[in-house]
Swiss-Prot record:
The species this protein was found in: Capsella bursa-pastoris (Shepherd's purse)
Additional free-text comment from the UniProt record: There is a partial copy of the N-terminus (positions 1-341) of ycf1 in the inverted repeat (BAF50246).
Membrane association type: Multi-pass membrane protein
Superkingdom of origin organism: Eukaryota
GO cellular component, one term: chloroplast inner membrane
Name listed for the protein in its UniProt record: Protein TIC 214
Similarity field: Belongs to the TIC214 family.
Function description: Involved in protein precursor import into chloroplasts. May be part of an intermediate translocation complex acting as a protein-conducting channel at the inner envelope.
One of the Pfam families matching this protein, by short name: Ycf1
Subunit structure, interactors included: Part of the Tic complex.
């Protein structure tokens, strides 16, 4: 039952998948998709369905629907029917049909009475309206849809059309699918309209029911035709923007096809048959149309013979091959004559109106310097051709075009080559059988190898080493090695790249006239008349191949296979029969000296365009005198210097140093700051068809892709970023609490100002006639300022001074006025001169710069009036202040062009300051007078106080007497009386007081006799106080009652109360003032009297003090004047003093010597020009102690003076330079404190033994093996190295000797890290500054940013070698230490003969100059073997390894001395070392160390070492060098060989690019601006000094020296050298390399050491060592499981991948689970390779099985390998496996 259910389920799934992948379902799906391509035709259809009513409306609906369906049916038929597709697919067809019809329809709707003839009921088809509705829907359906573009659907349909067999069924089903989708869409629209009509909520709306709405609806219904006409007009304009207009677009002038050379019209198929030099957005329709015409109408066929041409290079000779002069032109050059006769008749009318060869689309024009016109990219990215895929013949869209053309050529040329048509089933079965057989063979071989390995066979025999191309598997017959594509290295030989044909000289021809070889394939394809010669079959020359082996690209010594002579003849019978030409006939040999190339004529654009920028620069004036065809960024050519009338002295000097072809003017290109909308498009192309920019605003400043819509500052209602809004609010809230950062504000303000300035400049530049208006205004403002305004101001100022009885300042003002200069500048601010205007200044713009602007001053101070402090402040302000400005249109001044106006110094500001100072002085003087008066008036105050006290005493006495008299007469008859008008409350209080007073008086009178006077007083007072208290309490109670009764006071009462309070307060203050005024007057009188008396006393004291101060100031002025004169004589410019200060500061700098190497120290010691080196040499050589008795006293005293040794410490021996001491010094620095692994990798084998033995080794810097010998010191002394002679400059040498000795001492004593360079000398071209200034921090990691090193640190010579190994890998994850040496970086040894025989030749760094002809620029070994990329990558990471000056100045190479001998001696060197280093091996010591190379060199010696190939190489090299030198001399006359060599290096071998500093760029521009002005001035001293003071001109970049090298520029930090990856040349060798290079990467992983190789891939010694070394680990396999081999690694990488692919693909179309069913049975046998089943438990066994036998069939890298091999895609980045997904997994029936 379960089986039955699974069977039913499987059938259902398969049935469903078949239905889904059927043609009908896919067609329905694509048809349904096209329903959503809503175009303008839907407007007419909806209009007919919605608006029209009645009988005529139904007829219109029917006609609209009919036309709509008919138009869509035409579109679907055009997919299958090619003529209809050609008619509708061309752009001019739509233009001719659509635009006139749109205009007709527009006028039809506007003027109905012209076309309305009325309607007849009998024959409605005569009604023109119904016919127009049908035509509208039919024609508009053919237009391009604009909501969902039909181009995407068309591409999908076209792709599917190639895949399916029943194409008509697919078209029909797609049309049915569209019809179903259209019916559903219309039904949905009808339902929506019915819902709107029936919805009460919409109909019951107040607005809809209003009369106004009804009126609007009726108007809308009446004007619907007008609205549709407007919409159609907009659509018409929209299409006009996207369709090229035949009249208004710009026509380009095409170059004549016959005018170019043959090289311009043809391109080699070997380089690129259809190179994508021109990137189009869409396919070229013309080529597709032609292909479809050929496919559909098979009658018209292109003659294939006319497509292919042969490109030959030879000299014209008197006789042809067969001796007939009439047949001198070959047959394949007769094509042009046929085309000329029928050229006019073949051109249709359309091409006269529409130039189909023009760029109508906004494409980019990509230049190709090698050819004249660019190749038309007519194939997009696909090339269609039939091929076998999965056993079936399919159309592949990524087929290699080279193979297709080659296959067609073979089909034409070989008549016997016919293909039998086989059915698809036979092909698939045959294909599957072949691959099944291959898989079985591979499986058997694989299992046999595993069994052999399990039995204990040798690894060398089991591993598969090579893969050969076998064309007969039964007999195991292979292709020859030289033509086997699976092989590489010396067996393939080396194909030499011939030089350009102009350089081939007669000597080269003579050396090569030994007979030429013609391949039989070339003879078949080229159809040459060589069959008339005698054909002599010669055996294959093995010697030529063996010689070629030496120059292979990836050379590896491989074991040769021997063939019998009969087998060789069979192999070469068809392909390699060699035709020997007549050796006596020299003319024939000359014709066949050069090679023949198979070419195919490719279509080219008939235009050679230049850009507007090139026209401005004037580079292509001679070559292309046409107008530019490419729109560049808006730019203007500004001439900044013209040398029309040079001075005689300057001109003669310039003439000697300059070439004759030097231009007399210098111009700069000024670019516009606006956003560039044109984007380098071609003139006449439609800008609206650009893909990326989308315009969604009314005015959009910058056009960009909608991809970056989220980064735009959008409006609030467009932005939905709530989190960003929260962040902004929080940020503002937090920023309020924090302090404001003023630096950021200033920076933002400057950015805003700069942006505003650029906007103003662009607005002036964009408007018409704006520059003319601005220029005229600037010139008038300049004249007004200079000659009218400023002289008037001077006149007014001096006249006012004369009126105020002061001396006028005519001379000072006129001097400042004359100093002001109005310099005319370009629009960017480049200065020209006062009188010379820039060229085309009215159109290009002008700036006027004012130097030393005049400011009116109220007075001029004397030079010695200010103090020294004020003068220093003034100079400081002057340095910061700019003494120039730019003039604006309004007469204002700005610091930068179009900047904001500056504030002028005020005329009245110094006057106000002076007044304030004087007022302050008066105040201080008055205060002093008052103080003195106060001090002196104390005496008078004492007297006044005594008088005052006496008067008061007398007054008190008189007052007491008066009181006594008043007591006796209490009732006063006379007294004043006051009358008041009081209110009721006050009257009551007065009455009560009177009553109380009367009572008291009565009591007094009653008790007069009984009590005394004092007692009565006290009692009376007590009683009065009590009564007053009681009254106060009563009054307060009354007030409370009143307030309770009246809650709200009136406004008048409040006003009265407030006025009362104010009056009372004023009364109190007034009484207080009256009371205290007496004391105030007294105080004033006292102060005045004191001041007067003090002033009188101190008058003589003040006068004497002023007298002494005036004398002192006069003396100070005179002293300061003398000092100033002395300073002027010493330092005329303050900037020179700053330079001196910098130099003096450098002397005091301290440096750390911890990073100095011992080699550097002793090398510097070797350069000392005095004889003190011998003392140190004697001590170091004999290794004696300085305290011994055998050392001379002179040597002891020398070392004691130098501080190396102190003689008093007798127990301390001399710190000699043995390795032990040197090790101790190294251990003190952590960068040298390396582990044992690193030391094992850093040193050679001899050093390893010494380190393991812990023995002392002598100093490596003085041994013969590593560095400088005794003899080399003499050679160094002979060389100058740009130093002064020791005899002429002894003082300099003495100082240098001292410093170098100090270096030696500091290197031996590392504890003292710093020293002071108090000796005033700059070492060897700023040696200290360049090498040591950044070394005061220990550790090399912190100085990796350095880009230059002093070249004198180590003098490398790349001709002999010393071993130093880079790329040390100290990371070891495994338990053992791998001490094998992978590679070596070669550094030189110097011998006497080399120094004596040095000859300046081409630059030979990294072997670039050896075999210049054959050496390609791109070294492809570095891409797959990064460990070989020694110098460039090492230098990139560690720039202190190789000095920079060496890269540019060491051009010495010993080439011509015994070249034949060196070639014999050098033997065989693998090409990877040869390519990267190019060194010769001449030393005996290295011959012994590299003895394994001699095995190959002995083999080469046995053969003919001086063969024709080496001679040919030598001759070509020499001739090429001579021709290159002649070429360079004709172009440019160099001053020295160094300049010529450097130019050759930079142009041809520039592996490093030079980049200057970003700060240096601005300095250069500023200097150029100043130079342009200084050149035109007669006396430029003042301007030069002021520009240096302002910082406009930089002295550090001035080229003062004549021979200024690149190394010095790099030392200054101006130029920076950077490694750069070179561009790839797509030539034939690259294609061959890419096809072969993939297996080489995997094979290289098995390589261990280049030195220890013989013939195999695995070194026996290392393998045996590893076996013995790790035997104890690998014997017990239970404990440790080392996967030394994954079993599939037994096969070669290519066979391994083939095996995987054959297993992964189901050849017999089984289910996925049965793919590896056969192979799974053998998995159990594979476990015996490494382990036995007895010794393993289940978990480990499963783990190893999982690890070893997880076949990577689903890995991406394997898919990429399949992609590379099967689909001809060599670039991994363009991963085209995605295209495979376009084919469905299941077959289509």
């Amino acid at each position: 039952m379960m089986v039955f259910q699974s069977f039913i389920l499987g059938n259902l799934v398969s049935l469903c998948m078949k239905i889904i992948n059927s043609v009908v379902v896919v067609g329905l799906y694509y048809g349904f998709l096209t329903t959503f391509s809503i175009g303008p035709s839907y407007l007419f259809l909806l209009r007919a369905r919605v608006m029209d009513e009645g009988e005529e409306g139904t007829e219109k609906k029917v006609s609209a629907t009919t036309g709509f369906i008919a138009g869509q049916l035409m579109m679907f038929i055009s997919i299958y029917y090619a003529p209809l597709h050609l008619a509708l697919g061309r752009p001019h067809t739509i233009t001719v049909l659509a635009l006139p019809y749109l205009l007709f329809h527009f006028f039809w709707n506007n003027h109905k009475h012209f076309f309305d003839y009325g309607s007849t009921t009998r024959n409605e088809m005569r009604n023109l309206r119904i016919q127009c509705v049908f035509l509208n829907n039919l024609i508009f359906q053919l237009f391009n849809h604009f909501i969902l573009p039909s181009s995407m659907l068309a591409r999908l349909v076209n792709i599917y059309m190639f895949r399916c067999n029943n194409k008509m069924l697919f078209v029909t089903s797609s049309f049915v699918g569209w019809l179903i989708g259209h019916i559903l869409f219309m039904k949905w629209v009808g339902l929506v309209l019915v819902w709107i009509q029936q919805n009460n909520s919409i109909r019951s709306n107040v607005l809809i029911r209003s009369n106004k709405y009804k009126f609007l609806v009726s108007e809308l219904r009446n004007s619907m035709a007008r609205i549709f006409s407007i919409l159609l007009f907009i659509t018409c304009v929209y299409y006009l923007g996207r369709i090229p207009s035949p009249i208004f677009t710009k026509k380009l002038k095409g170059t004549s096809e016959t005018g170019g050379t043959k090289q311009d019209q043809e391109v080699s198929t070997a380089e690129a048959p259809f190179p994508s030099l021109f990137s189009e957005e869409g396919e070229d329709l013309d080529k597709i149309d032609e292909m479809e015409e050929i496919r559909v109408n098979e009658k018209d066929k292109i003659n294939k013979d006319d497509e292919f041409h042969v490109r030959t290079y030879y000299k014209t000779v008197s006789e042809n091959l067969d001796g007939n002069k009439e047949n001198s032109n070959l047959e394949f050059f007769k094509i042009k004559k046929k085309e000329d006769h029928f050229l006019w008749f073949e051109k249709p009318f359309v091409t006269l109106v529409f130039d189909y060869k023009r760029w109508n689309r906004p494409n980019r024009y990509i230049k190709n310097d090698k050819i004249e016109n660019t190749v038309r990219n007519e194939m997009a990215q696909y090339f269609f051709y039939t091929c076998q895929s999965d056993g079936k013949e399919r159309i592949a869209f990524t087929y290699p075009p080279n193979l297709s053309t080659f296959f067609e050529m073979i089909q034409k040329r070989i008549p016997s080559f016919t293909r039998e048509k086989i059915t698809s089933d036979q092909v698939s079965t045959y294909w599957s059988l072949i691959h099944e057989e291959k898989k079985e063979n591979l499986k058997k071989e694989f299992l046999n190898r595993i069994e052999a390995l399990d039995k204990g066979g040798s690894v060398e025999n089991i591993l598969e080493k090579t893969t050969r191309f076998c064309y007969n598997e039964a007999k195991k017959e292979y292709l020859p090695k030289i033509y086997d594509p699976f092989l590489h290295g010396i067996s393939r030989g080396r194909i030499k790249k011939l030089p350009p044909f102009k350089i081939i000289t007669e000597t080269y021809r003579k050396n090569n006239i030994r007979g030429s070889w013609i391949n039989k394939i070339h003879g078949l394809l080229l159809k040459l008349n060589y069959h008339k010669f005698e054909q002599t079959i010669e055996n294959f020359n093995r010697k030529s191949l063996s010689i070629e082996k030496k120059l292979s690209f990836f050379s590896e010594p491989q074991q040769e296979e021997k063939f019998n002579s009969e087998e060789e003849i069979k192999i070469f019978k068809f392909l390699f029969d060699i035709v020997r030409t007549d050796s006596n006939d020299q003319t024939l040999i000359k014709n066949f000296i050069d090679f023949h190339e198979i070419n195919k004529k490719v279509p080219r654009w008939s235009y050679k365009l230049i850009s507007e920028l090139e026209e401005l620069e004037g580079e292509n004036e001679e070559n292309v005198p046409m107008e530019p065809g490419i729109r560049s960024r808006k730019a203007k050519r500004v001439v900044v210097f013209t040398d029309k009338e040079p001075h005689d002295e300057i001109y003669t000097n310039l003439k000697e140093n300059q070439n004759s072809d030097q231009k007399d003017e210098m111009a700069l290109i000024r670019y516009s700051q606006q956003s560039d909308f044109r984007r380098e498009i071609i003139k006449g192309s439609m800008r609206s068809q650009r893909r990326k920019p989308v315009i969604w605003e009314f005015f959009q400043a910058k056009v960009h892709s909608p991809l970056f819509f989220d980064r735009i500052d959008k409006l609030f209602f467009f932005s939905f970023d709530i989190w960003g809004l929260k962040k902004k609010i929080l940020k503002n809230f937090i920023s309020q609490t924090k302090k404001k950062n003023f630096d950021k504000k200033e920076e933002e303000q400057s950015k805003i100002e700069e942006k505003r300035r650029i906007e103003i400049a662009e607005t002036w530049d964009s408007f018409l006639f704006a520059q003319i208006i601005r220029g005229s205004l600037l010139v008038t403002q300049s004249i007004l300022r200079k000659y009218i305004i400023l002289p008037l101001l001077i006149l007014i100022k001096n006249s006012v001074r004369m009126l105020l009885f002061q001396f006028p300042e005519w001379s000072e003002d006129l001097k400042d006025w004359k100093r002001e200069m109005h310099v005319k500048c370009t629009y960017n601010g480049v200065q020209l001169s006062e009188t010379e205007f820039p060229r085309n200044w009215l159109t290009d713009g002008i700036q006027i710069k004012i130097l030393f602007p005049f400011y009116l001053k109220p007075w001029h101070k004397s030079k010695f009036q200010a103090s020294q402090k004020a003068r220093l402040k003034k100079t400081k302000d002057k340095g910061e202040k700019n003494d120039f400005c730019f003039l604006t249109v309004w007469g204002m001044e700005t610091e930068l062009p179009f900047g904001s106006a500056q504030r002028k110094p005020s005329f009245f500001e110094p006057i106000s300051k002076e007044l304030k100072k004087r007022i302050k002085k008066l105040k201080t003087k008055s205060l002093v007078v008052l103080r003195i008066f106060k001090e002196r008036a104390t005496i008078f105050l004492k007297v006044a106080n005594e008088i005052k006290n006496w008067i008061l005493k007398n007054f008190i006495f008189i007052k007491g007497k008066i009181k006594d008299l008043s007591k006796r007469n209490p009732i006063s008859l006379f007294g004043p009386r006051e009358i008041y008008e009081l209110n009721e409350t006050k009257k009551d209080s007065i009455i009560r007081n009177q009553i109380i007073h009367e009572l008291s008086v009565q009591n007094k009178s009653m008790e007069w006799t009984n009590s005394s006077l004092s007692e009565n007083k006290i009692t009376n007072l007590i009683d009065r106080i009590k009564t007053i208290r009681n009254q106060i309490e009563e009054i307060s109670k009354e007030k409370q009652n009143l307030t309770n009764n009246c809650t709200k006071l009136r406004y008048d009462s409040k006003k009265i109360e407030s006025s009362k309070k104010i009056w009372q307060a004023f009364k109190r203050k007034n009484t207080r003032l009256i009371r205290k005024s007496i004391f105030f007057f007294k105080f004033c009188i006292e102060q005045l009297s004191i001041a007067i008396f003090l002033g009188i006393i101190n008058i003589p004291k003040i006068t004497t003090q002023l007298f002494f101060e005036s004398i002192k100031t006069i003396l100070d002025k005179s002293i300061y004047k003398n000092e100033e004169k002395g300073e002027k004589k010493k330092n005329p410019f303050y900037f020179i003093s700053t330079i001196k200060n910098l130099i003096s500061n450098k002397k005091k700098m301290s440096y750390d010597l911890c990073s100095l190497s011992q080699a550097y120290v002793f090398y510097k010691l070797s350069q000392i020009k005095v004889s003190n080196v011998s003392k140190l040499k004697d001590v170091l050589e004999y290794n004696i102690c300085i305290t011994s008795f055998f050392v001379k006293n002179k040597i002891k005293s020398f070392f004691q003076e130098q501080g190396i040794f102190h003689y008093e410490l007798k127990n301390k021996t001399f710190l000699n330079s043995e390795v032990n001491q040197w090790k101790n010094w190294l251990r003190s620095h952590y960068q040298y404190n390396l582990p044992q692994i690193a030391w094992a990798r850093l040193v050679t084998q001899n050093w390893k033994k010494k380190i393991n033995k812990d023995s002392l080794v002598l100093n490596p810097s003085l041994t013969k093996e590593d560095s400088y010998e005794k003899k080399k010191f003499d050679n160094y002394k002979k060389q100058n190295f740009f130093e002064a002679d020791s005899v002429l400059n002894p003082k300099h040498n003495f100082k240098k000797d001292y410093i170098y000795n100090l270096f030696c001492y500091k290197s031996i004593h590392p504890t003292e890290n710093f020293f002071d360079m108090y000796v005033g000398i700059a070492l060897d071209n700023c040696l200290v500054s360049s090498c040591l200034e950044k070394y005061n921090i220990r550790g090399m990691r912190e100085i990796w940013h350095r880009k230059y090193v002093d070249w004198r640190i180590l003098n490398f010579w790349f001709t002999k070698k010393v071993n130093i190994e880079p790329w040390v890998n100290t990371k070891s994850k495994k338990k053992y230490i791998n001490t094998k040496v992978q590679n070596y970086q070669r550094i030189d040894k110097i011998t006497k003969t080399d120094l004596a025989n040095q000859k300046s030749f081409f630059f030979d760094w990294m072997g670039m100059n050896e075999e210049i002809l054959n050496h390609r620029i791109t070294n492809f070994e570095f891409f797959f073997f990064p460990e070989f990329f020694l110098f460039s990558s090492t230098y990139k990471i560690k720039p202190w390894v190789i000095p920079i000056k060496l890269l540019l100045l060491n051009f010495n190479e010993n080439i011509n001395v015994n070249k034949k001998l060196t070639r014999k001696k050098k033997g065989f060197i693998p090409s990877n070392e040869k390519k990267s280093l190019r060194f010769y091996n001449l030393n005996k010591e290295e011959k012994e160390s590299a003895g394994q190379f001699e095995l190959e060199s002995d083999k080469e010696k046995k053969r003919n070492p001086e063969s024709a190939l080496l001679n040919q190489e030598k001759n070509i090299e020499e001739n090429f060098a001579e021709s290159m030198i002649k070429k360079r001399q004709n172009k440019k006359q160099y001053k020295s060989n160094t300049e010529a060599e450097l130019d050759l290096f930079l142009t041809r071998y520039s592996r490093f690019q030079l980049r200057w500093n970003c700060f240096f760029n601005q300095k250069i521009l500023n200097n150029v601006k100043v130079y342009c002005l200084l050149v035109r001035l007669n006396n430029p001293n003042e301007i030069a000094i002021s520009s240096i003071e302002r910082g406009e001109m930089s002295l550090d970049i001035l080229m003062i020296e004549k021979n200024f090298t690149f190394a010095k520029l790099m030392k200054k930090g101006i130029l920076i050298i950077e490694p750069v990856r070179l561009s790839v040349q797509n030539d034939g060798q690259l294609i061959i390399y890419r096809t072969i290079g993939i297996p080489l990467v995997h094979k290289n992983k098995h390589k261990i050491s280049k030195r220890s190789k013989k013939k195999s891939y695995i070194d026996k010694k290392i393998f045996e060592k590893s076996k013995t070394k790790y035997q104890n680990k690998t014997v017990n396999r239970k404990k440790k499981h080392y996967d030394f081999f994954v079993p599939e690694n037994i096969l070669s990488p290519k066979r391994r991948r083939e095996f995987r692919i054959l297993i992964c693909f189901n050849l017999k179309k089984k289910t996925a689970r049965d793919r590896n069913s056969r192979f799974d049975k053998n998995i159990q046998n594979l476990t015996t390779v490494l382990h036995k089943k007895k010794d393993l438990n289940k978990e480990k066994n499963n783990l190893i099985n999982l690890k070893s036998f997880l076949w990577p069939k689903f890995r991406l890298e394997d898919l990429a390998c399949m992609n590379r091999y099967w689909f001809n895609t060599t670039n991994g980045t363009n991963f085209s496996m995605i295209r495979i997904r376009m084919y469905t997994r299941f077959p289509i029936h």
